[in-house]
Design a protein with these regions (language model features):
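N-terminal Rossmann-like FAD-binding beta1-loop-alpha1 element of flavoenzymes
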Residues: 5-32
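Conserved Rossmann-like nucleotide-cofactor binding loop
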Residues: 15, 38, 260
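Glycine-rich FAD pyrophosphate-binding loop
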Residues: 24-47
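Dinucleotide-binding Rossmann-like beta1-alpha1 core, especially the glycine-rich loop
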Residues: 49-124, 167-174
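Active-site/ligand-binding neighborhood in enzyme catalytic cores
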Residues: 110-118, 122-238, 256
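Mid-domain catalytic core of redox enzymes
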Residues: 229-332
């Protein structure tokens, strides 16, 4: 069967749905092709015996008014959580971010962190920083960097900090990795009573339906066709084929799929482009979902694990995000690991 459509969008995750929503608001006809049986992508979820698990770790802390309006239209009611993330380091619970909440550590370790923090060079131009390893040492000193973010980077990103660039860190004000003052580091060594310095002051989550519920307003009145896995794209003839044998003629094509996968679908791709695609790196996440018969779990929405002998990089508790995620009287945890 051959179908004519002015704009085809590949993938019904948040990116593909966002593109369809924006175009339809401007009066443009769209068709979204999704290989799965429902929308959501990594923002989707699945349910086993009454336990609902998001496909990855999600909260909303968006500041854009339009995004928040769309999310609220979809979710209806939300829980508004104050971030209470913690860190697990050698059996010790440390408030997040660790760099200005070191109170539970031994005095010897705290002294080493403060000493290195005070001895950081202050006259280095940011343009001289060549990688993430250098950035971490410059921000926090050698001791803290080597015991906390550098080993965590290897666990989470499955690569060395020296192999990562730093543009993703953004500005000091917008960075997800808090950069405390000397006074904040010292205060966090002397007391556990410290203010919340997480990069977002509020984390929002739907009361019902999991994180996917935020996206439900995006799918209203959209032409989304499921079980449509794209296998080939003929750019010259503007023709796309799916594994079911359907063909779609397109004027414009928008893809939210991984770039190397799109390259495989295209015809007559130059060798240098194929080679460039093969050199691209990505990190894949794996989650272990656990439903528990008890509510007796740590009271933290999520926590990071710095110890290299413990495989998961972080753990989070969907039942604390919303009790709708679990049967009554139960709880759940998800352990997150990464693999190249």
């Amino acid at each position: 069967m051959k179908m004519n459509n002015p704009v085809l969008i590949l993938g019904a995750g948040i990116s593909g749905l966002g593109a369809a929503y924006k175009l339809s608001c401007n009066g443009q006809q769209t068709v979204v092709l999704e290989k799965d049986t429902t929308y959501g992508g990594l923002c989707g979820n699945f349910t086993i015996d009454g336990f609902r698990f998001d496909r990855f770790v999600h909260f909303s802390f968006a500041k854009d008014e339009q995004v928040n309006r769309i999310f609220m239209d979809g979710a209806g009611e939300v829980f508004r959580h104050v971030p209470n993330a913690y860190n697990l380091y050698q059996g010790i619970w440390i408030k997040h971010p660790a760099q200005n909440n070191l109170y539970p550590l031994s005095q010897k370790m705290k002294d080493a962190v403060v000493r290195d923090f005070l001895s950081r060079p202050t006259d280095i131009d940011s343009s001289q920083i060549q990688n993430y390893d250098q950035w971490l040492r410059l921000q926090f000193g050698h001791f803290f960097a080597e015991h906390f973010p550098i080993p965590y980077t290897k666990k989470y990103w499955m690569t060395e900090a020296k192999d990562l660039e730093t543009r993703w860190m953004g500005s000091r004000e917008g960075s997800r990795l808090y950069q405390p003052s000397v006074e904040e580091v010292i205060q966090g060594c002397n007391t556990s009573e410290t203010p919340v310095t997480y990069y977002s002051k509020e984390m929002r989550y739907p009361r019902k339906g999991g994180f996917k519920q935020f996206l439900s307003a995006l799918v209203e009145n959209q032409d989304i066709r499921y079980n449509q896995q794209v296998i080939s794209i003929d750019v010259e003839n503007r023709l796309l084929r799916t594994s079911k044998g359907d063909e779609y003629q397109f004027d414009r094509l928008i893809s939210s799929l991984p770039l190397p996968e799109v390259i495989k679908m295209l015809k007559n791709v130059p060798v240098d482009v194929c080679n460039a695609a093969a050199r691209l790196h990505c990190t894949c996440g794996y989650q272990i979902s656990v439903g528990l018969k008890t509510k007796n779990i740590p009271p933290y929405l999520w926590w990071y694990i710095y110890d290299e002998d413990i495989l998961p990089a972080r753990v989070y508790s969907p039942s604390l995000k919303s009790p709708d995620n679990v049967p009554e009287g139960r709880s759940e945890e998800r352990r997150v690991g990464k693999e190249c």
